[in-house]
UniProtKB/Swiss-Prot annotation:
Keyword terms, alphabetized: Ribonucleoprotein, Ribosomal protein, RNA-binding, rRNA-binding
Record has Glycoprotein as a keyword: no
Known function: One of the primary rRNA binding proteins, it binds directly to 16S rRNA where it nucleates assembly of the body of the 30S subunit.
This protein's name: Small ribosomal subunit protein uS4
Native source species: Aquifex aeolicus (strain VF5)
C-alpha cells in the first residue's frame, strides 16, 4: 500500500478522532463530526463495524497517527515487537516513538509528524553531529538530536520552538531550546499515557494474529 496523499481532515472525520495533528483539526471535527463523502452528513452516524472492521480501524488509526506509515513498515515494527519478551502492544509503541521523525516532532521542532518527516528527509536534522535523512531511523538512549545550524533560521522551526510547552515533552527526552537540541534520556515507557488519541493495542495484536 502506498502512502496516503489525500486531505488529512478526511481521515480525522473517518476515524472520529484527530490523527492529522493539525491545530485546526479539533474545531473542524467538532463542526463536521460525521464521515466524509457524499452521504456522510445524510447518514450521520458511522456504520457499525464487524469484529474484523474494529481491529482494522484501530490499526489504521495508529498508522496514520504516526504520519501515515506504509503497511509494510508498520508490520515490520509489529513483527519486531512480537518477538520481544515484553508486551507486544507496548513494544510496538516504543518502536514507533523511537523513529527519528517522531522524536523531532516530540521535541517541538515540527508541528506535526509529517512536517517532522520532511525536516529529516531534507537533511535539516543531525544525530550525534551527523546528518541523518532517514525518518525511520531508530534513536537510542544517549543520542543527541539537533537542527543543523544553517537550518535554524527557518521560520516555522523557530516558531514551533517558541510555542513548545516543556510539559508536553515526554520524560524520556530532554530539550535544550536555546541550542535547537534534544537528547534521548532513556527508552520510551508508558506511551499510552501521553498518546494523542486512545488506541486499543489488543485489537491490533488480534488483527495481525488473524491475518
Amino acid at each position: 500500500m502506498g502512502r496516503y496523499i489525500g486531505p488529512w481532515v478526511k481521515l480525522d472525520r473517518r476515524f472520529g478522532v484527530v490523527v492529522s495533528g493539525k491545530k485546526s483539526a479539533p474545531k473542524i471535527l467538532a463542526r463536521r463530526n460525521y464521515p466524509p463523502g457524499q452521504h456522510g452528513r445524510k447518514y450521520g452516524r458511522r456504520k457499525k463495524l464487524t469484529e474484523y472492521g474494529l481491529r482494522l480501524m484501530e490499526k489504521q488509526k495508529l498508522k496514520f497517527l504516526y504520519g501515515g506509515l506504509r503497511e509494510k513498515q508498520f508490520k515490520k515494527y509489529f513483527d519486531m515487537a512480537s518477538k520481544s519478551k515484553e508486551n507486544t502492544g507496548e513494544m510496538l509503541l516504543q518502536y514507533l516513538e523511537r523513529r527519528l521523525d517522531n522524536v523531532v516532532y516530540r521535541l517541538g521542532f515540527a508541528s506535526t509528524r509529517r512536517q517532522a518527516r520532511q525536516l529529516v528527509a531534507h537533511g535539516h536534522v543531525l544525530v550525534n553531529g551527523k546528518k541523518v535523512n532517514i525518518p525511520s531511523y531508530l534513536v537510542e538512549p544517549g543520542d543527541v538530536i539537533e537542527i543543523k545550524e544553517k537550518s535554524r533560521d527557518i521560520p516555522f522551526i523557530k516558531e514551533n520552538l517558541e510555542n513548545v510547552d516543556p510539559r508536553s515533552i515526554p520524560s524520556w527526552l530532554e530539550l535544550d531550546k536555546d541550542n535547537f537540541r534534544g537528547r534521548v534520556v532513556r527508552l520510551p515507557e508508558n506511551v499510552q499515557e501521553y498518546l494523542e488519541i486512545p488506541i486499543n493495542l489488543q485489537y491490533i495484536v488480534e488483527f495481525y494474529s488473524k491475518v
